[in-house]
Every structure is written in C-alpha cells, then in structure tokens.
C-alpha cells in the first residue's frame, strides 16, 4: 500500500530575474539606478502573465511553485480466504459463490432414490447402472490422479473363487468383489472389531448350536440380481461340496457344519443343518458343537456370498454312460476370474492378465451408501525390489511393497524429539515404534498377527514324466524312500520326512535370531509356537528350538541317518547309491534324496532364509536344492506337493487361537493342515478339538499347553517370528482405521488431489 506525502515550497522574488526582466521593459529604474518610482499592477501586467505587484519591495514578482514528492512504500500481507464449494455448474449443488472446488459436487439423483426405482421396476438394470455411475463416480482432478490407486506387489492371485482361495494375494482381490455377513474393521485404537456387512444381526439358541441370521434387504449382485438368504446357504454349502481341491480352505467351514448334500446338487439347501426363508431374508444354521469362534470364521473370504443362480447356470458336471457324476467343478471355472454378477461388494474385475496386472472398477450397484473416492484400482506384479522402489519414489504408484532396507528413504527415527529430520536419524530404523515420516510420506509402525514360518512336507511327491511344472493340475507320485515301520524288513513304506527326528534336526539348523535381527531388520518378534503374542493363551508356549548345528547332527546320527549315500547320485525321487562302509570318508550324505527348499521370487527375505537353511543342512550332510521359483511354479509345487520345505507366512482368517493351531498342526481329519504337510498326531488333534470346542478358559488353556508339549517333540514346521514393522504410503492417500486382519478395502480409501504442487483438503 502506498502513502504519498506532499510539501509546498514558499515563493520568493529573484532579484536577478527581476532586473533582467525590467531591463527588457520600457520602464526605468532598476536596482542600483539613481531614479526610483513607485510601480503599479499595470506595470506588472505589462511585463507578462503571472506577475504581481510586491508593493513593499516596489517590484513585480513571479512566484515559482516547486513541488517535492516523497514516496514511502509500506507492504502488508493480506490473506484472502477463497470460498470453497462445488464450482461445476452441471452439478446439482453448484455454488455460484464458490471459488475453489472442494469435491462436494453432487450429480444426478441420489443412490437411494435410484435403487428405490430399480427395486420398484420403474427403471431397468442398464438405466440404473448409468444413473448410479453419474451419481457416484469420483470426479476430482489433480496431477496425482486422485480417483485412482496403483499398487505394485510381488505375488499374483491364484484364483478369485472364494471357495478355493487361501493365499493373501487372492484374498486381497476377493474382498473387493465379494462380501461376507460380517467383517473385521479397526476401532481407531489399533484393535480389531467385527462389524456387520450383509447381515443385520443374529441370535443363538440356548444350547449354543443354532445361529439365526437376518440379512439386509437392499443388496444386489453386480449384474442387478437381488441377494437372498438362499444365496448365503448355497455359497457356504458350495464350499463344503467343492472341498477346496487346490487350497483346502474348506476346512474353515467343514469344522462347523455339514450340508448333508450327498446328491451334490444343493437343491436341498443344506439338508438338516440349514433352513432359510427368502421372503424374510433370514436363515439358520446348526453347528456340530458350540463354537466361540463361529462368527469370526464366516468373516473370512471362505464365507463370501456368491450368486447362486449364476453359479448353477455355469456349473460343469460330467457324467459317465450310466449317468454317474465323474466330475463337478461347482462353477469354479466361471468364478475363477471374478465375473460380472458373481459378487455384491464395491468393485468388479475389469481385467486380469495373470502374472502381470489386475484392474478393478466400481460395482455401481454396491449397497453401501456414499460416492466412490476411487474409480480404478490397478495391481501390478513386479518382483524386482529396485523397480518397485523407483516407481514408488517417483510417485508412479501409491503402494510399492517396499523392502525393509529401503524404508530409510522415506522414514526416520526422531531421536531428539524435535520433529525435524537431523543428520544420521535415517541411518537405521531400530526404534520402529517411534518412526517418523519424511516430507511427502506417511510411515506407520504396525504390530501384526502375521507369522513367518517354514512348513515341512511329510508326504513329498515328484512330478510324473512329461508333466508341466507350471500347471497346478499336473500329476505327481509319492516319494517312498524310508522304512518307517521299522519292522526289520528292507522296504520303503514312507518318506524320510515322516520321521520326527529329521524334522526336529532341521528345526535346530535354522538361525532364528540372525533372521529376526538382520534379515528382517528387527521386524520379527520371537514366536515360539503357533499362537502369536497378543492372542489368548500365547503364554502356553516357550522357547524350545534355537540354532544348534551340533545338536541337529547328533539327532540325525542317533536316528540312524548316517553318512552313507554318494551325494552326486542323489535326486528328488530316484534310487541313491550307497557307498560301501569301508570306502566312506565322512563326506557322504545322510538322506537318500535331495530336499527341495522352496521360496518364491521377489520375496528376498524368504530367499535369504532358504539359503541359510540349505547351507547349514549341507554342513551336516543333508543335500538340498532350492532356487527361488516364479509364482506360477511356486503354486504348482505347493498344489502338487512337489516340495519338502516351504518358506511361507500366515495372516489370520479369524481372531482365535484355533485359527493358528488347527491350520498349522491339526490334521486333515479335524479340518486342519492348511499347508498340506500331511501331518497327523492324534494327541495334538484331540487337544486342538478341546481347545476349539470348550467354553471353559482353564480347559482351553490346558489343551493348548498339552498340544504344544506334544508338538515340539514332533514338529511339522519351523515357526520363525511375528511381523511387527513399518508401512509407508504417500501423504495424499487417506486410509481407514488400521486393522491387523484382512485386506485393504478400497471403497473406504480416499486420495487428496494435488493441484499446482499442493494437496487440496486433508484426511481428517
């Protein structure tokens, strides 16, 4: 702002000027002359304009006015608050006074009004979908594509069929496409709660066996078909009938009820276990035994609801000449890629190029109110950590599956508490609970219930000649190379992996502390048994296995696994060469075959652990092989059981100790053995059943103590640690309350638009 100040200077007569002027006139008498007369104004006028008579001095004078201008500059900062609102004149709530679009523009009719018309039949499905898209889609614009989430990860889904999916990559997609009656959510304090989804409530009979559910009456599949109670019954009984041939995920429901569906056509809607009424949208299920975990089990993806009519229409049943069923895919081929109309959740699968990318777009018929913040989700499969790091750093992706060692690029530990990154504070991230974020990122410490482990296969196989190692349906044959009956007869009636001593020795050959501390950079907390810290009955376990190669070798020696085989002769399944006793020099191998140690490409931590175990076993005479496998080959090895030791992980299906013990060490007979180890220990099974079914805390605790004491003498896996680490995202991504179970649900996410280098709005 400018303030001018003006000052006038007084006029004065100039003698020199007057004399000069008067000499030029006809007047006589100038200063210094002898004659002086009195002047008049007429004399001054005769001289020229602007001359006036100065009678006191008897002179004609002109006044020169000089103006001096002094300029002073004062700067003020004026903060002008722009009016926020809807600036799009095409929107229902256009605000002509708004100067900055806040993303609140409303288009078309409301979600509820459109669905009411669709329910009444006044508009068809195509009109409803059109209007819903106009009404609900994200319209924000910015340089960061605020209506889209892009993620890079290392593992592709195996299937989008909830009835045969038991890997996290598949579950991450299934939870976007299909919905369940209940689901886990965060409570804002780091705890998990169960919230209703397709169900509005349930009641339980006095004996604890019969659950009666009431369902929402406003839910439609993505093709416009309405969901009824019968769809839930069909979905659950399909899981039981199909039997999860690849994943065995069906155990989660098998443990609770039987559909009594011997004819396999589901026309009896679950037999004696189920009743349902589509008119009232209610159904009941009767369990084998009371279960404190039942609601938790159906919150997992195996409890997802599919479109019963479309499944039946796409079900492939083959019969022989006599009409006997020879195969039944229970519509798996149709559900495998998540087709339109299959599910009721917020997204549909637009495209899936296996081992490359999956693209999801909105299911505009989705029942939950509110507009979409994310119109498109893309998941790309990238196994190279450096590529993911670069893409995340450059802002090409919102989530990049960042390796632990790369987190220092985005996070630091504020050691002096001044809220500023100081020199050296990003050298290491040891104090993970106190992690801080560098500009542009959000780093968060999370304590999870995810377990890192390595499973043992007690019944390993080899692929038959000519079979494809990337085809999960390839034929394979058991490797029988040991006399487990110990009856003195020289026969091979089992595999060496069936012997508890070998599995115990392998457990002592693993360097637990090095991997927890160095491989995982202190992101793995010790876990000594199946139950993770933070769960009920975790204190029934204690440390047994440590890194002790001398003990491992002693166990093998005492069990009769002496150095006797020519190492170069060993294969995965063929007959080995036995070195004559007199010719042995102590370099021979102890087992009749090579153990296949399995890890997947892109997971550098599993690869490092597998490498250490192979090296350690080699020093005590156990031959191994195990380069990292591409995901299709990894899954094929898993499904065909053509592996001996497999590094993997476990994220919970439901929050109960049984969800660790049963899938880890329960046999197939009690609905366990999720890892396909072939493990069966009657004492363990009996105690796990008690722990699962008992309603008495003391009885459950004792059952898990008994199971642990038996299991450590006969282990079927190495339990390495519980993951507690740091996650990172860009600061434009707004996430819902964090929960340590289940997938991210993209309908609940938001992404702030970036305009002219600045984020518009906030996540709060």
Question: Where in this protein do the model-derived segments appear?
Answer:
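Secretory targeting signatures
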Residues: 1-44, 66-78, 114, 506
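N-terminal lobe/hinge region of extracytoplasmic solute-binding protein
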Residues: 152-206, 340-344
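Gly/Pro-rich hinge or "lid" segments in bacterial periplasmic/extracellular proteins
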Residues: 185-189, 290-293, 298-378, 384-387, ...
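Aromatic- and charge-enriched surface segment that lines or borders ligand/interaction sites
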Residues: 200-248, 282-286, 388-393, 496-498
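Surface-exposed binding/hinge segments that line
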Residues: 214, 248-324
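Detector for C-terminal structural segments
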Residues: 353, 418, 452, 507-544, ...
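Append "and occasionally in soluble cytosolic enzymes with long acidic Gly/Pro-rich linkers
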Residues: 359-362, 466-484, 491-615, 619, ...
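Ligand-site clamp/hinge motif
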Residues: 364-419, 424-429, 444, 448, ...
């Amino acid at each position: 702002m400018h303030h001018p100040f003006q000052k006038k200077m007084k006029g004065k007569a100039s003698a020199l000027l007057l004399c000069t002027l008067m000499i030029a006139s006809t007047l006589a008498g100038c200063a210094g002359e002898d004659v002086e007369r009195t002047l008049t104004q007429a004399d001054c006028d005769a001289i020229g304009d602007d001359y006036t008579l100065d009678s006191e001095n008897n002179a004609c004078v002109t006044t020169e006015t000089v103006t001096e201008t002094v300029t002073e500059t004062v700067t003020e900062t004026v903060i002008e608050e722009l009016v926020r609102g809807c600036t799009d004149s095409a929107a229902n709530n256009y605000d002509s006074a708004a100067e900055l679009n806040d993303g609140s523009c409303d288009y078309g009719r409301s979600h509820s009004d459109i669905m009411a018309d669709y329910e009444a039949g006044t508009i068809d499905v195509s009109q409803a979908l059109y209007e819903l898209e106009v009404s609900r889609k994200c319209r924000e614009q910015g340089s960061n594509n605020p209506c889209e989430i892009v993620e890079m990860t290392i593992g592709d889904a195996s299937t989008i069929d909830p009835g045969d999916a038991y890997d996290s990559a598949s579950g991450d997609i299934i939870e976007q496409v299909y919905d369940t009656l209940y689901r886990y959510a965060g409570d804002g304090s780091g705890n998990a709660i169960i919230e209703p989804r397709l169900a509005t409530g349930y009641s339980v009979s006095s004996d604890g066996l019969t659950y009666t559910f009431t369902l929402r009456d406003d839910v439609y599949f993505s093709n416009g078909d309405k969901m009824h109670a019968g769809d839930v019954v069909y979905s659950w009984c399909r899981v039981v009938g199909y039997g999860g041939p690849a994943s065995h995920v069906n155990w989660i429901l098998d443990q609770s009820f039987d559909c009594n569906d011997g004819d396999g056509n589901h026309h009896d809607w679950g037999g004696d276990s189920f009743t349902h009424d589509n008119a009232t949208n209610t159904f009941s299920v009767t369990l084998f035994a009371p279960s404190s975990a039942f609601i938790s089990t159906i919150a997992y993806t195996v409890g997802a609801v599919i479109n019963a009519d479309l499944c039946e229409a796409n079900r492939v049943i083959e019969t022989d000449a006599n009409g006997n069923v020879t195969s039944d895919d229970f519509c798996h081929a149709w559900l495998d890629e998540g087709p339109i109309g299959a599910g009721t959740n917020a997204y549909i699968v637009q495209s899936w190029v296996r081992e490359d990318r999956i693209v999801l777009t909105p299911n505009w018929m989705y029942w939950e109110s509110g507009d979409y913040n994310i119109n498109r989700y893309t998941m790309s499969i990238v196994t190279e950590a450096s590529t993911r790091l670069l893409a995340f750093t450059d802002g090409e992706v919102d989530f990049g599956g960042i390796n632990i060692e790369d987190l220092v690029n985005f996070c630091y530990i504020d050691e002096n508490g001044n809220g500023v990154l100081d020199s050296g504070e990003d050298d290491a991230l040891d104090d993970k609970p106190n992690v801080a974020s560098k500009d542009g990122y959000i780093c968060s410490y999370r304590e999870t219930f995810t377990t890192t482990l390595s499973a043992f296969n007690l019944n390993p196989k080899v692929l038959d000649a000519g079979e494809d190692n990337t085809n999960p349906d390839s034929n394979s044959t058991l490797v029988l190379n040991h006399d487990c009956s110990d009856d003195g007869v020289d026969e091979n009636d089992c595999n060496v992996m069936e012997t508890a001593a070998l599995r115990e020795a392998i457990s002592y050959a693993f360097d637990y502390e090095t991997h927890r501390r160095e491989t995982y950079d202190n992101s793995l907390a010790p876990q000594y048994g199946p139950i993770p810290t933070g769960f009920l009955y975790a204190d029934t376990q204690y440390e047994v296995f440590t890194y002790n190669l001398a003990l491992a070798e002693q166990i093998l020696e005492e069990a009769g696994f002496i150095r006797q085989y020519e190492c170069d002769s060993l294969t995965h399944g063929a007959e080995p060469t036995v070195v004559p006793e007199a010719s042995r020099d102590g370099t021979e191998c102890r087992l009749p075959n090579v153990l296949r140690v399995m890890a997947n490409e892109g997971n550098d931590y599993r690869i490092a652990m597998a490498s250490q175990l192979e090296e350690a076993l080699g020093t005590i005479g156990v031959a191994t092989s195990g380069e990292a496998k591409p995901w299709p080959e990894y899954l094929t090895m898993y499904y065909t059981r053509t592996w001996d030791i497999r590094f993997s992980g476990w994220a919970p299906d439901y929050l109960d100790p049984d969800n660790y013990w049963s899938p880890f060490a329960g046999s197939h007979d009690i609905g366990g053995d999720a890892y396909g180890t072939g493990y069966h220990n009657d004492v363990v099974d009996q105690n796990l059943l008690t722990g699962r079914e008992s309603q008495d805390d003391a009885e459950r605790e004792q059952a898990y103590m008994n199971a642990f004491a038996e299991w450590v003498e006969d282990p079927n896996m190495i339990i390495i640690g519980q993951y507690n680490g740091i996650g990172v995202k860009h600061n434009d991504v707004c996430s819902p309350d964090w929960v340590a179970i289940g997938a991210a649900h993209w309908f609940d996410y938001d992404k702030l638009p970036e305009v002219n280098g600045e984020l518009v709005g906030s996540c709060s």
